[in-house]
Amino acid sequence: NNAGVMAPPFLKTYENLEMTFGVNYIGYYLLTNKIMPVLRDVSGSRVINISSIAHYRVNGINWDNINSQIHYNKHEAYDLSNLFRIMFTVELEQKLRQKNYQTIAISCHPGVTITNICRHIPMAKVLQNNSIFAKIINKLVFHTPHQAAMSALMATTSLSVKGGDFVGLDTK
């Protein structure tokens, strides 16, 4: 699962869910449950949920405001959606073990990378130009998309990764 939006203005999905919550969490949940009948009995199969260390910034959950424009903060919505992804992965892993399915579930952080997911963040636009300043900052601070893909590749193929793990760049 690698769908995601980051810091869009307040929008709702067709299903009337706040966009970040709907895409980043509910989308993962629905896709995973749709394909689970195929995966669960395949030895070595894995559900890899791309997430982020942004979940560490969550400082409580306002359950009354999950789907509301009132007090909406686009950065908090992103952080919270990543926490929900990781909680979903841990819960999924527990259920897979209880039912003795062959599939494992893993959360994966690709590292801090400037890609199109950052399109709603003004500073990211500055860092995507070809100026000397942008090139230096990008080299010193951010991972390339190629480097970011390595964490998903590790989650997909490494024998040392166990179900329920949170792996990736900047995590272990």
Please place each PLM-identified region on the residue numbering.
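C-terminal helical subdomain
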Residues: 107, 131-172
